[in-house]
Amino acid sequence: MLYKITSIKHSGTCGERGTDRIDDRYPQRIGRVVKLDIDYIEIGYPLIIQYIRDSDGTSMRFSLLKTSCVKNYITIDDLEGIIKYITIETENSIFEFERVNDE
C-alpha cells in the first residue's frame, strides 16, 4: 500500500514531544509517498521506509530511509476495513501517514 508522510514529530528523546521535526532533512520528507506494509513493522527494530516519489512527483523508487527502532504503532481503518492512517512512533520520531491511491 502507498502512503503519504503527513507529519514527522519529536518523540521526546531529542526535542519536545509532539513538536514538528524541523531539523536536518525532516521537512523535506513531508509529502513524500512511500510503500508501507504493516506486516513488516516490528516493535524493537528499525523500520525501512521505501520512498516511491517526492512531494513534487519526482520518482524516488530506489531511495530508502532507515528509522530508529519502532516503539509502537497504531492504524485507523476506513468503513471497509482498509487502513487509512498509520502512526508509527520510533525512538526519535513520530511519523504520521495517510493512504493514497496506488499507482
Regions found by a protein language model. Give the residues of each.
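Short, compact, well-ordered microdomains
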Residues: 72-103
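N-terminal non-globular leader segments, chiefly Sec-dependent signal peptides
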Residues: 1-81
